[in-house]
Amino acid sequence: MSTSKRKIDHLKICLEEEVESGYTGLEDVMLIHKALPEVDYWKIDTEIEFFGKKLSFPLLIASMTGGHPETKEINARLGEAVEEAGIGMGVGSQRAAIEDESLADSFTVVREKAPNAFVYANIGMPQVIERGVEIVDRAVEMIDADAVAIHLNYLQEAIQPEGDLNAEKGLEVLEEVCRSVKVPVIAKETGAGISREVAVMLKRAGVSAIDVGGKGGTTFSGVEVYRVNDEVSKSVGIDFWDWGLPTAFSIVDCRGILPVIATGGLRSGLDVAKSIAIGAELGSAALPFLRAAVESAEKVREEIEYFRRGLKTAMFLTGCKNVEELKGLKVFVSGRLKEWIDFRG
């Protein structure tokens, strides 16, 4: 099956099937309500700077799609809304457009619609191992990217019938990429989370930030369950549907090692606020914006505003004048997340 066909299959499955794994760990985080906030809601400053780009509030639309003619309009709507809102976004894996240059416009449309926004390129670690720095450079140049995400999607590859399963010398190759590429490198999981031990390895390799891509949002093991035809592969995919570290577990594990992007089941501005309070620099989500973009750019704008309003409300009700104060907020942690923190010391 061509990479392009696989991409549109993934997109349709995400839109039409139940592909979320549920528990993110953010359910175990409570922001402590301040009955007298002593701040003016209208003066709250949500702006941050990320890799030299100002964002109106700490949100990225996560890597999602591209690489098929049907995805061009989706990326155009996302880019348009991101530019207007003053936030950032990532494109989906650019492998298909590198293999077939006729598909490049499904990605380049993002930069056309968002000339000033923070936009990051995206390519898979299996392809980087196979082809080296050259493929990363091409991904960056294709969209004039401000950064590049190298996605670590080995759970998906293990379930996928045509999966790339060689991870040998991955760290060595990643070190070479970080030395050579002219933009910051983000190491990005795609639904199974990143542990402290791996975060330390990634820092030593020269990675600039981590997108934890934790469990709790879209499960690509689940996505592959809907694609595979043989019963053994389907059964294995079901077994690993809930595999990985929940998003909040990864955030607390990786904080302080590298800047953390919180992705994996964030569905509101409150989720973004909780993520920042426990150690993330900013939040990110894909599925809510994908569903909105299928309808219109206006729906994407509404979803962005929903996240922005929720974040600002959480900041107001906890007495935070800016995002730095949110980072220093004391929170109540319970349940499995508390057990994880105790276990990890």
From Swiss-Prot:
Provide the primary localization: cytoplasm
User: What do the Gene Ontology cellular component annotations say?
Assistant: cytoplasm
Tell me where in or outside the cell this protein is found: Cytoplasm
Reactions accelerated catalytically = isopentenyl diphosphate = dimethylallyl diphosphate
Residues where substrate binds:
6-7, 93-95, 156
* PANTHER family listed in its UniProt record: ISOPENTENYL-DIPHOSPHATE DELTA-ISOMERASE
Member of which family?
Answer: Belongs to the IPP isomerase type 2 family.
Q: What is this protein called?
A: Isopentenyl-diphosphate delta-isomerase
What organism does the record attribute this protein to? Archaeoglobus fulgidus (strain ATCC 49558 / DSM 4304 / JCM 9628 / NBRC 100126 / VC-16)
| Lineage, top ranks | Archaea, Methanobacteriati, Methanobacteriota, Archaeoglobi, Archaeoglobales
